[in-house]
Amino acid sequence: MDKPMYKRVLLKLSGEALAGERGFGINNDVVNDIAIAIKKIQEIGVEVAVVVGGGNFWRGRTSEGMDRTTADYIGMLATVMNAMALQDALENIDVATRVQTAIDMRQIAEPYIRRRAVRHLEKERVVIFGAGTGNPYFTTDTTAALRAAEMEAEVILLAKNVDAVYDKDPKVHADAKKFTELSYMEVIQKELKVMDSTATSLCMDNKIPIKVFELTTENIIRAVKGENIGTTVK
């Protein structure tokens, strides 16, 4: 395999992506494929941190009638389920993995401690961050931007169920325009569905590029090698 473009990356996985075509729960085949991709990029010297969403179990913004704070905490718990599933898949193929959660649940995961997380990465362990930031009103996209800054990751790999960023939904509009490169401000001003504005602003302030692409094993590897796939935001 070619030499990687990045030494340390943060891979952001949406919960929906983990569900596969079923749209709900965890698709073991998808999770196993992601684990294989992570192992392959780790084998060429890339340190990998992961942030997982929880949308395959819970969508807080659509929980009508529920207190927003409560809904967000339920969403955080959903991300921990996904983190544990991915950890299991990775360890089944002999990839040392640690789950760290922003909410203390020591029976199943380490508490989030920045220095410890960095040390795990340096020791070639995959670190999966669960429970978001630990605070309501913050998305897992914002978690990804925050953890990428804290881990000093060189790029956020945003693996989604679409192949790039478009000006409108390509599944609905045949004339949707595909972007290959965007600035942070364009994403914010055009309200493009990349990350929410808080996450995008955090990436802009810390000069962390974002690569958006369709979640496949091959694409994760290609993104790490710096190939022109999907959309790059910088």
Curated annotation (Swiss-Prot):
Annotated Pfam families: AA_kinase (PF00696)
Name of the protein in its database record: Uridylate kinase
Coiled coil: none
Gene: pyrH
Known EC number: 2.7.4.22
Species classification: Bacteria, Bacillati, Bacillota, Clostridia, Peptostreptococcales
Main location: cytoplasm
Keyword Lipoprotein: no
Species of provenance: Clostridioides difficile (strain 630)
Keyword Kinase recorded: yes
Catalytic reaction(s) noted: UMP + ATP = UDP + ADP
Residue numbers binding ATP: 12-15, 55, 59, 161, 166, 169
Disulfide bonds: none
